[in-house]
Amino acid sequence: MNMIQSAKDQIAALTRSAYRAAVQEGLLPDGVETVPAVEIPKDTANGDYTTTFCLAASKAMRKNPREVANILTQHMKLDGTYFTSVEIAGPGFLNFRLGEKWYADVVEDVEREADAYGRGEGLKGKKYMVEFVSANPTGPMHMGNARGGVLGDTLASVLDWSGANVWREFYVNDFGNQIEKFAKSIEARYFQLIKGEDAVEFPEDGYHGDDIKELAQAFYAEHGESYLDKTEAERHADMARFGLDRNIPKMKSDLERYGIKFDEWFFESSLHESGFVADTAKKLTDLGWTYEKDSALWVKTAEIMRDQYRKQGKKDEDIDKLGLKDDVLRRANGFYTYLAGDIAYHRNKFEVRGFDKVINIWGADHHGHVARLKGAIDALGLDGTNRLDIVLMQLVKLVRDGEVVRMSKRTGKTISLSDLLDEIPVDACRYFFNAKPDTQMDFDLGLAVREDSENPVYYIQYAYARICSLLKTVADEGRSVPATDKADLSLLSGEQERALIKELANFSEEIRMAARDYDPSYINRYLMRLAGAFHRFYNACRIKGEADDVANARLLLAAATRQVLANGLTILGLSKPEKM
């Protein structure tokens, strides 16, 4: 249960009921809309919740807000609710103070729901796909892939905890120009092995990394010089397949090491081989969205994007300045472009597989493609405007001792995901990369391996381990944590106890907001606050040496905190160490 929402709902109901009673007595006019806005004030010294209803409704009632507030408070019946008092503040705020029943219900909810505590049903019945990483399979994964990987994975978790049926997908770009370039790069290195580096020119736009040399060496070890006599087309096809067959399993292995497993690795080539790309181009043509020029098939991208920008509220004179141009779908040589494949892929997501919502995690450098793709899906009649969402993530810088790090100490090459995981614990990588997507981030390599409270991962996991140690000590002494119905939770009335319970109650709301904003870093920040609230409680509230009833209530609160920390760590894909 979302206890924050339950409290807000009660205040809304109390306000509506008081208003109706006042109307019946002729004290307030009828016909005023009663949808009270209820918030948690920044300063809770005067109350735990507040509503501005009296301020908002006073004009329609033709009364002073404080007069409205006075009338409503006289008609509010708090018996049986979560609240012990309601007070008028300032120009007409109504401030409500929580009673012990709410605090007890939070702890009871955690005990009852256990591993499911925090789960909601706001997206129940909705079929979501999160497509992320989708790194080029022609080489090692980089820091952008590392960030996109954890953002996509934790966003999928947040959506799952919000009730959605979630599908994680990796789109494998195994078709087109980059694969041809990949094959030519391996081919050139293969020829150089046989004829010498100076005898064979390497393609200027080829892939220059050592990984290509290693693939060429492996290909030569397996096939010798036999491919000198093959046709270029045979060499390119076989070398590309050879390279992909080695790179893709390595990518899967690195991602699984990173804690990421996909429901499907979807291959771009399957869309071309099945004719689905050609069929999608035909459908766009039938709908009037293409034309032929210079023996190529063009899509009316400028018109499509103009429609998209208008939907975003942009004015035509501003759109004109963007210099929008149409794009080629099928080249004069008969080959389809990457855009054609991408449109077909997203048509497949909606039309063939029936996803209600598709979320793509992209680097911010792809921002220009957003309106183009959403508009193309609109053009197909599949409502890309509302069903396709793109999360754009900013750049990552690796920093050590205040200096930007570009090369791996171990390999001397640009740092790959695999290199990073060799140096930094997976938990730290996942936590630090799960930063707010639209902010550029500096990944502090030194901080990530520190074992003190400056490292947020350590700080959170230490809170979890501390509770485990406490409960083990209690068990070793022959005591157990009582069930909530066997304990007097009203004894949890101290400042630090109630602050901790309020933080436990926030968990469901944090998940809801993370899903709403496509920002799983809400959970990072929440766990830091929860760990801090626990450490303050632990330092202020003794358990050993206290009377049994007080000790039992505090043990229950500690156990509830461990449960919520565990659930949050599960969402983030982090481990739960019982000792540190």
Question: Where are the regions a protein language model picked out?
Answer:
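Non-catalytic interaction-recognition regions
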Residues: 2-104, 111, 115, 119-580
